[in-house]
Amino acid sequence: ETEGSEWAKDLSSRIIAIAGMKLNEANPLVRAWTEGFSRVVIYPSRSLNSVENSSVSEEEKKAEEAKAKKINFAAMRAMDACKKRGEVILVFPAGTRYRPGRPETKRGLREIDSYLRLFDIMILVSNNGNCLRFNPEDTENMLRDLVCKDEKILCASPVIDCKTFRNDVLSKLPADDPDPKQKTVDKVMEILEAQHDEIEKIRNVHEYF
């Protein structure tokens, strides 16, 4: 917010991040860091799926589903208000950090299609390099992440018209496609991966200390 051209400072001041509920509930210290950013809290489908696949009772699962719907309905209203105020939404389409050996963490979440319908334009930003890596002994505990030296490169796509992008993807699908919304998100992830792979060719990769 203090460096760069005036337009960049203005853009930075308008960014509202989408934060999964885990960042608010997992740990008081993680929550304290999260609260340093302007954000809208959502209940990611990946989190709900983990509850549905667990051993909790059906009553608890239904209660969690109701909680998720309530949180996400409020989140969509909040994002619509952000749009009307001229703010920019920052969202990680996979809903989590990629975990090597777990390809499902690299797949975009189906609900990202809702963002494509809600907003007018988007920029896809890929992030090469990682200074904060999973601890292989405890990949679910963010407080045990490993701080590492690395070269980070951020790369942004051209501005993309959301409606045109979405319609183009849908127009190429068969009429009986079982999940067209997921296909639009898959295309987003395809572009991000290609962008990432291209930058990786010129990046100096650093290993752990």
Go through the PLM ranges and name each one.
Residues 65-81:
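A Trp-anchored, charged/polar loop motif used as the substrate-binding/catalytic surface
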Residues 3-4, 38, 97, 127, ...:
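Hydrophobic/aromatic-lined pockets within catalytic cores
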Residues 1-63:
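Catalytic core of membrane glycerolipid acyltransferases/transacylases, capturing the structured
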Residues 13-16, 38-39, 72-75, 85-89, ...:
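Generic beta-strand structural signal
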Residues 33-34, 82, 115:
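Structural alpha-helical scaffold elements that stabilize or flank donor/cofactor-binding regions
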Residues 68-73, 104-105, 181:
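A conditional alpha-helix N-cap/helix-loop micro-motif detector
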Residues 164-176, 180-209:
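Extended, histidine- and acidic-residue-enriched regions that form the cofactor-binding/catalytic faces
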Residues 85-175, 206:
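A cross-family acyltransferase "interaction/gating" segment
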